[in-house]
A protein has these predicted regions:
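Residues lining hydrophobic/aromatic ligand-binding pockets adjacent to catalytic sites
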Residues: 1-237
Length: 237
């Protein structure tokens, strides 16, 4: 499976990670605006809110070279927004300080920031998925060496030529069975996108503002972890 890097990735991203022993992040793509590469979604008292971070516009296009812009106080604003949204969630206090420490450390690049955040949530949800990067565009670094993980290449011109498989999260009732259509490459880097329908059908879980807005699917994985804590792994699998 090949995915793009993502900032506080959505729940569907982690539900996909839970189904593979190894997942490759595309290290040879260009930065794409208005994507999960530098934005995430949380649920606040006012509804769904997008959190973004700015990048340095220095001509760098390769995703691993894009630098984070810390000239504005976006870290403080992000932490305030997360505090306000989740201070009353059951498990927020257990994760707050260690999570904010990542933001406060000011990783230089988008790739590093997202990588550290993804590694954090893998550890806290208990997933053992190994994350690797591609060696060329659409090419896993060690193609064929991971049993059960397909190694597929997808050229940019093919990105919209197929319908992504639909999976279901099971909410703790064991692994779902996924049956991708024949010929569908295991590459969802463009399918998981804020402006596209989710490739996952999320089971419901408790959310802080559920009585006000109903259940809101596919928020950042932080929403799941802060509300479900150690049980998050059961939901994802």
């Amino acid at each position: 499976m090949i995915l793009s890097t993502a900032y506080f990735p959505p729940v569907e991203y982690f539900a996909i990670l839970a189904r593979y022993s190894v997942v490759y992040l595309e290290a040879h793509e260009n930065y794409v605006k208005q994507s999960y590469r530098n934005r995430c979604r949380i649920l606040t008292a006012n509804g769904v809110e997008d959190l973004r971070f700015p990048i340095v516009h220095d001509g760098a296009k390769l995703i691993t070279e894009v630098k984070v812009d810390y000239k504005t106080p976006w870290v403080r604003q992000t932490e305030y927004a997360i505090d306000s949204a989740y201070y009353s969630s059951p498990f927020f206090e257990y994760y707050r300080d260690s999570l904010f420490a990542i933001l406060d450390s000011h990783p230089e690049t988008l790739w590093e920031l997202n990588g550290r955040i993804t590694a954090y949530f893998l550890a806290k949800t208990g997933l053992s998925t190994e994350i690797r990067s591609t060696s060329a565009f659409g090419v896993p670094a060690t193609a064929g060496s991971c049993p059960g993980v397909a190694s597929a290449s997808l050229h940019p011109s093919q990105a919209d030529a197929w319908a992504p498989p639909v999976y279901e999260t099971t909410g703790g009732h064991g692994p779902a069975v996924d049956t991708p259509s024949r010929g569908v490459p295991d590459n969802l880097r463009e399918a998981i996108h804020p402006k596209r329908e989710p490739v996952m059908k999320n089971a419901e879980y408790w959310q802080v503002f559920r009585e006000r807005f109903g259940f809101v699917p596919n928020l950042s994985v932080m929403d799941l972890l802060f509300n479900e804590g150690p049980e998050s792994i059961c939901y994802l699998r």
